[in-house]
Amino acid sequence: MQISIRKITESDLADIVRLLRDFAEYEKLSEYCEVTVERLYAAMFAADGFVGGLIAMDGETAVAFALFHPNFSSFRGERGLYLEDIYITAAYRRHNLGERLLREIARIADSRGLTRIDFQVLAWNEPAVKFYLKHGAEHNEGENHFKFVGDAFKTLSELPA
């Protein structure tokens, strides 16, 4: 198994969308997966694109990916990367591919002068939790993740300041 890892290019977007749908199914979140090639292109390659990514290839087959974007810790005053997704297809798990992707993301962050990588893991995904802890990640047990989406976002955005 000779796996190469490189930056995602525009020609990879259909593969990334396919892998994202697989990932959503794995995480039991398929009903929320609305990504399209066009949306991904806008986020990654348009003039105001802000998402970066890596793809792992076994020959001509995309077998894993990672997506990330800039973030900022206000209390620490530090810029970092937010690891939005890292996903490895089932047949390629347990072959150090996750570790290779994570190391490459850390190198990218370091080369940009960034000092942290933040991410979330679903509570039930024990293999992922163990993976990140094994590599030295800190678990912030006292935090809860919230979001405004759909009607709640629209309502909030239409209220006067």
Please place each PLM-identified region on the residue numbering.
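A short beta-loop-alpha structural element at the N-terminal edge
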Residues: 4-18
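Conserved GNAT-fold acetyl-CoA-binding loop/helix
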Residues: 17-42
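A short helix-loop-beta-strand connector motif used in the catalytic cores of GNAT acetyltransferases and
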Residues: 43-55
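A conserved beta-turn-beta hairpin within the catalytic core of GNAT-like acetyltransferases
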Residues: 72-83, 93, 140-141
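C-terminal "cap" of GNAT-fold acetyltransferases
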Residues: 115-118, 122-161
